[in-house]
A protein has these predicted regions:
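C-terminal capping alpha-helices of c-type cytochrome domains
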Residues: 103-108, 131-155
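The canonical Cys-X-X-Cys-His
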Residues: 70, 74-85, 105, 134, ...
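Intrinsically disordered, low-complexity segments enriched in small/polar and acidic residues
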Residues: 25-29
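Sec-dependent bacterial lipoprotein signal peptides
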Residues: 1-15
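Gly/Gly-Pro-rich "capping" loops immediately C-terminal to redox-active cysteine motifs
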Residues: 71, 83-111
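Bacterial signal peptide processing site
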Residues: 17-20
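Axial heme c-ligation environment in periplasmic c-type cytochrome domains
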Residues: 89-96, 114-143
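Electrostatic cytochrome c docking/interface patches
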Residues: 30-73
Length: 155
C-alpha cells in the first residue's frame, strides 16, 4: 500500500515539474484575403446572370414612386432573410449594385432556382450563406424592377 502511495506521489511530482508551454495567442482579426474570397463582397459587374433580363437601362435620376413600391415589396417578401445594412440569413442589399449588374440582381429575384443551378456567383453565395436557398417569391418583372430601384436608393 505504501508503494502505491509513493508511486502516486512521484507521478504527480514528475508531471507537475515539466516545463509549461506558453499560452497560444488568439487573434480575432479578420483576414483580408478571406474576405476577398467571399462571394458577397466579390465584384462582378459583367455577369448578367441567367433569366429573362438580358439588358436594362437605369435612368440617372432615381424614381421615388418606384422606390416606395419596391420598398413595400421588399419589406413584405424579403425581410425574413435580408436585412438592410447587415448580413442575416442572406446578404444585405446595401451596395449590391456596386458589386452586381442590375440584370444579375433582377434575374436573381425573378429566376432564383435556375440562377442557383447555373450561375457560378449565385452558387458561391449559396455556399457562403450555409446552403440557405433563396426562396423564389414568384415576382413579376415590374415588381423586381421596383425592388431594384429601392436598392439603388439604398446606395
Amino acid at each position: 500500500m505504501i508503494y502505491r502511495i509513493a508511486f502516486l506521489f512521484l507521478s504527480l511530482i514528475i508531471f507537475q515539474c515539466r516545463p509549461k508551454e506558453a499560452p497560444k495567442e488568439f487573434s480575432f482579426k479578420k483576414k483580408e484575403k478571406e474576405s476577398l474570397r467571399k462571394a458577397s463582397v466579390f465584384v462582378d459587374l459583367k455577369n448578367k446572370g441567367v433569366g429573362p433580363v438580358s439588358s436594362i437601362v437605369l435612368e440617372e435620376v432615381i424614381d421615388s414612386v418606384l422606390v416606395r413600391k419596391g420598398e413595400a415589396i421588399y419589406k413584405e417578401k424579403c425581410t425574413v432573410c435580408h436585412k438592410i445594412g447587415s448580413k442575416f440569413i442572406g446578404p444585405s442589399p446595401n451596395g449590391i449594385l456596386k458589386r452586381r449588374s442590375p440584370e444579375w440582381v433582377m434575374n436573381m429575384i425573378l429566376n432564383t432556382d435556375e440562377m442557383l443551378q447555373k450561375d457560378s456567383l449565385a452558387k458561391a453565395l449559396f455556399m457562403e450563406f450555409d446552403g440557405q436557398l433563396m426562396v423564389n417569391q414568384k415576382l413579376n418583372e415590374e415588381e423586381a424592377r421596383a425592388i431594384l430601384e429601392y436598392f439603388r436608393a439604398l446606395e
